[in-house]
Amino acid sequence: MKTLTPQYEDNNSHVPNLVKKDRTLYITMDHVMEENHYIKKIFIIRENEVIEYNFTPEDEIAFAFPYSEEIKVYALCNKHGLWEGKIK
């Protein structure tokens, strides 16, 4: 099993876009969704819960999720690994 270490870099298409409005967290990606290069998974971690969303190259990534103080969001690119989002 390979250990994945999250990366973070502002203005990088691999980093999930996270916008908090009221009690909702809006999650989008600017990443390409092509057969050879796409976001495979989004992980939402809050309190004692891990929620995993799986994607295909045909999918568009844009959804809302209830906000909590302890939330973390990661995106997994099939080529470039794991990336951590920061709430803006």
Predicted regions and their residues:
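Transition segment at domain starts
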Residues: 1-22
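Beta-strand signatures of extracellular beta-sandwich domains
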Residues: 41-45
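Surface-exposed loop/edge segments in extracytoplasmic proteins
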Residues: 46-54, 83
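Short strand-edge motifs at loop-to-beta-strand transitions and within beta-strands
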Residues: 59-63
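Edge beta-strands of extracellular beta-sandwich domains
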Residues: 79-88
